[in-house]
From Swiss-Prot:
The record marks 182 as: Transition state stabilizer. Substrate binds at residues 8-15, 21-22, 60, 87-90, 98, 114-115, 183-184. InterPro entries: His_Pase_superF_clade-1, His_PPase_superfam, PG/BPGM_mutase_AS, Phosphogly_mut1. HAMAP family: PGAM_GpmA (MF_01039). Catalyzes the interconversion of 2-phosphoglycerate and 3-phosphoglycerate. The active site is at residues 9, 87. This is 2,3-bisphosphoglycerate-dependent phosphoglycerate mutase. Keywords: Gluconeogenesis, Glycolysis, Isomerase. The keyword Isomerase applies. It comes from Chlorobaculum parvum (strain DSM 263 / NCIMB 8327) (Chlorobium vibrioforme subsp. thiosulfatophilum).
Length: 247
């Protein structure tokens, strides 16, 4: 049996302010830093050890991973960062308050933008300063790879090749792996692992800073999955994520 740990970054400053974040490089809030520290301690207490780690290229995921590995005395293990693990790109919604956006466009429309599988938010203009082509960390990407907006289907399409080509072979080889990423990039992977339908994925909410453990067979098919920690706190955290886009 193989184990994989997925961890959504700790609360970011824009999570705290209930704003659409996407690819904007916002740091952790004070609460988020504490969540990351608690996640690392919990993993250590539960006897987890990792051989390698993966993160997005956004600081809220990177800092969460740093903190977790520091707590576990594993800062020496190899860490690979990839834009393919980035949060879903929220297009022109990035920076907007979710509640105010729901008041303007309606709860139903915002729920579609946030949670539907194949409906992207309005796109950023190519000359918008928020467009990823303006950020040098993406300088090596082709124009076709750079999103101006994404739906979850798009996020799946960029994440899964990286999973199959880079991460999965390491797990198959016996490496113990942690992936620290984002709500929607992790939803994309969970959708694939658990074979969740396009319709049912709408109801999946991944809370910040709580480790999600997958036990996998030799073909990397899930045997079971579970969150570590207090289950009542988990339920509250998932409900809070679900309510974020309501007026």
């Amino acid at each position: 049996m193989k184990k994989l740990v997925l961890l959504r970054h700790g609360e970011s400053q824009w999570n705290r302010e209930n704003r659409f974040t996407g690819w904007v490089d916002i740091d952790l809030s004070e609460k988020g830093r504490e969540e990351a520290k608690a996640a690392g301690q919990l993993l250590k207490d539960e006897g987890f050890v990792f051989d390698m780690a993966y993160a997005s290229v956004l600081k809220r995921a990177i800092r969460t991973l740093w903190t977790v590995l520091d707590q576990m005395d594993l800062m020496w293990i190899p860490v690979t960062k990839s834009w393919r693990l980035n949060e879903r790109h929220y297009g022109a919604l990035q920076g907007l308050n979710k509640t105010e956006t729901a008041q303007r466009h309606g709860d139903e429309q915002v729920l579609i933008w946030r949670r539907s599988y194949d409906t992207p938010p309005p796109a950023l203009d190519a000359d918008d300063e928020r467009h990823p082509s303006k950020d040098r960390r993406y300088a090596a990407l082709t124009p076709e790879e750079l999103p101006a907006t994404e739906c979850l289907k798009d996020t799946v399409a960029r994440f899964l090749p990286y999973w199959h080509e880079t991460i999965a072979p390491q797990i198959m080889d016996g490496k113990r792996v942690i992936i620290t990423a984002h709500g929607n990039s992790l939803r994309a992977l969970v959708k694939y692992l658990d074979n969740i339908s396009d319709e049912d994925i709408v109801g999946l909410n991944i809370p910040t800073g709580i480790p999600l453990v997958y036990e996998l067979d030799d073909d990397l098919k899930p045997i079971r999955s579970y969150y570590l920690g207090d289950q009542e706190e988990l339920k509250k955290a998932q409900e809070a994520v679900a309510k974020q886009g309501k007026a």
